[in-house]
């Protein structure tokens, strides 16, 4: 279910958008406002996934509303739907942080397609970030950005891409033994290669030193088998 806030001063268009998306297409919970001031209040109270807004509205226009929202909320998807079609208007919207600009007139199916494409993209980005972020004792590994964050001290350490790859594999299989050749294959695209194996030992020693701040965390060597990230 997509929670959608429509901010539109045209009563008939607002009704058509709400009815079509909520009742005909389905999968939407639609909240409506008639101007930017009401839109800001609804955004605060309802916390929508998507805001679809006109620009030329009374009290606070679309530009003013988005500027206010983007001061504290960079996540909500914002789409302008407007008859203002000059390049300057379009550029102004994107400078403020909107995600898309649909020129009036348009049909509800077009709006639905834009909304769902942006929601899918946003959820995919969030899923990727969450998938590659791991809690390891007092640490948080962000494998996407090769950083290790100490939640206790607030210190952030940049590690190498290879170190991030290795720790990522171990964190995915926390408290389980991961075969050395599996790590070598994923990180170096080789199996039991001597030089890659020695490089792995060097990286493991560096990671052990980085994780030493938390006694409950350690990387164990299981002789003849592989490595194990142990956490309590």
Placement of each model-derived feature along the sequence:
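Receiver (REC) domain active-site loop signature in two-component systems and cognate sites
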Residues: 57
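Two-component/phosphorelay signaling modules centered on CheY-like receiver
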Residues: 10-31
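Short, Lys/Arg-enriched segments at the junction into DNA-binding effector domains
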Residues: 116-175, 181
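DNA-binding patch around the recognition helix
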Residues: 126, 131-134, 158, 202-232
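Positively charged, aromatic-enriched patches within helix-turn-helix-type DNA-binding elements
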Residues: 155-159, 165-215
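Helix N-cap/capping motif at the beta->alpha junctions
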Residues: 18, 32-41, 62
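Short amphipathic alpha-helix used as the core "switch/output" element in two-component signaling
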Residues: 41, 63-74
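Basic, amphipathic DNA-recognition helix from helix-turn-helix-like DNA-binding domains
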Residues: 72, 77-135
